[in-house]
């Protein structure tokens, strides 16, 4: 990716995080380029939003992979992955508002859902914890997956609305998630 393209995407993220309806003119101004230059790299607003979404997915995947690899204990892996997803989600929350979160069946059927995929690793941890009876076996994995996503969204929303401090939101999210799935640490 060229430096100008990266700069435009960063400017778009900054603008849209504050105001989803900011104009491309405002994004160009924030990036320090002309609108014409912006259109050399992005054909329209939707193209720019797609690029922001892809950037978010790449960064979130990277952060969650790092969180996964940072620990050997599966519970600490899940906790760190939750925190990484909250951090990345907070940085790109406008994307979540513009694109609906995928359902479990859509995620599971995608080609990207391979053995190296961070979601696959997360799901494997959940299945293993369930087999070990460390989490409630009455809950299905799709339910737990959607619950995980909902807790991330709730954490982000609570911080954005000013109801909860950013650091507290992570503690509350982890307490909520482990309680909801009956996690035995």
Predicted regions and their residues:
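Alpha-helical DNA-contacting segments of helix-turn-helix folds
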Residues: 47-56, 92
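Hydrophobic alpha-helical segments that form the core
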Residues: 136-158, 168-180
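C-terminal peripheral helix-coil segments that are non-catalytic and often amphipathic
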Residues: 120, 124-131, 161-185
């Amino acid at each position: 990716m060229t430096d100008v393209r990266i700069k435009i995407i960063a400017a778009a993220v900054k603008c849209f995080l504050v105001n989803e309806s900011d104009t491309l003119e405002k994004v160009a101004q924030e990036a320090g380029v002309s609108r014409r230059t912006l259109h050399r790299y992005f054909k329209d607003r939707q193209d720019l939003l797609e690029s922001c979404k892809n950037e978010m997915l790449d960064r979130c995947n990277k952060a969650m992979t790092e969180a996964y690899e940072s620990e050997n204990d599966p519970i600490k892996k899940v906790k760190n992955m939750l925190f990484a997803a909250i951090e990345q989600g907070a940085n790109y929350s406008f994307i979540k508002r513009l694109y609906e979160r995928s359902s479990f069946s859509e995620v599971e059927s995608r080609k990207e859902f391979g053995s190296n995929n961070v979601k696959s690793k997360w799901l494997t941890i959940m299945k293993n914890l369930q087999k070990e009876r460390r989490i409630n076996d009455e809950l299905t994995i799709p339910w737990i997956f959607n619950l995980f996503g909902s807790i991330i969204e709730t954490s982000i929303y609570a911080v954005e609305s000013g109801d909860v401090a950013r650091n507290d939101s992570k503690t509350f999210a982890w307490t909520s998630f482990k309680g909801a799935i009956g996690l035995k640490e």
